[in-house]
From Swiss-Prot:
Belongs to the bacterial ribosomal protein bL33 family. GO terms for molecular function: structural constituent of ribosome. It comes from Pasteurella multocida (strain Pm70). This is Large ribosomal subunit protein bL33. GO terms for cellular component: cytosolic large ribosomal subunit.
């Protein structure tokens, strides 16, 4: 079984509303606020802002 630590899985969803997303982990203790990061969206072929969403 995996070790239980402060890192949780999150989903980064494109703000271009294409449905594209990335998955990553983040440490909730060090970064309690929602993550926003600029990444490449292959659907629109541009760099756009991705916002954090919960994995269902």
């Amino acid at each position: 079984m995996a070790a239980k630590g402060p890192r949780e899985k999150i989903k980064l969803v494109s703000t271009a509303e294409t449905g594209h997303f990335y998955t990553t982990t983040k440490n909730k203790r060090n970064m309690p606020e929602k993550m926003e990061i600029k990444k490449y969206d292959p659907v629109v072929r541009k760099h756009v802002v991705y916002k954090e969403a919960k994995i269902k």
